[in-house]
A protein has these predicted regions:
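Short functional hotspots at interaction and active-site rims
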Residues: 1-174
Length: 174
């Protein structure tokens, strides 16, 4: 693993950042709340936190130098079939020859047809070294996305999906 990480870091300076597309997925749910709050000294902070049943969805997207690309929300956990559908319908139409699609080693990313779908567009597929989420910059974008979702506190799936769309449109290079 150490050798794979060293090889990855050695190759990075040779890559054209405008050709990189980082892909990952994250879970979102209707029970997301801020982990901390503020109130006047000596006063008790009172906030509503959902209990009971909530819905979880999966958000998958790509990150380019100029922002998020090909966002996709699905009301199910990620599996190979869903990921392949995402590639064919959302990501592949946005890819150009020479681009490098980079993703982690999730089993859903290794199903038959993934590499072929990406390479059919003229792009290449690179897998990150195992256990290396720190090498995928989309992780920081997802942390920011989740912070916005916690702040919004949406409690229904349609409202959550609308909020995801609003936040994703705000991801720009600045």
């Amino acid at each position: 693993m150490r050798v794979a990480r060293a090889n990855w870091k050695r190759e990075q300076p040779r890559l054209d950042p405008t050709k990189l597309v980082f892909i990952d997925e994250t879970g979102t749910s209707t029970n997301m709340t801020r982990p901390r709050g503020r109130c006047r000294r000596g006063k008790r902070l009172v906030a509503k936190v959902p209990h009971g049943h909530w819905k979880t969805t999966t958000f998958v997207a790509g990150l380019r130098q100029d922002g998020m690309t090909a966002p996709f929300v699905v009301d199910a956990p990620m599996d190979g079939e869903i990921f392949l559908t995402y590639l064919e319908r959302c990501l592949a139409p946005t890819l150009s020859p020479g681009e490098i699609v980079t993703m982690d080693n999730l089993p859903a990313h290794k199903v038959a047809g993934v590499r072929e779908t990406i390479e059919a567009t003229g792009a290449r597929l690179w897998l990150l070294p195992p256990y290396s989420p720190d090498l995928n910059p989309i992780e920081q974008s997802f942390a920011k996305l989740k912070a916005h979702l916690r702040k919004a506190g949406e409690r229904s799936i349609p409202a959550l999906w609308d909020q995801i769309g609003t936040v994703v449109r705000g991801f720009t290079p600045e």
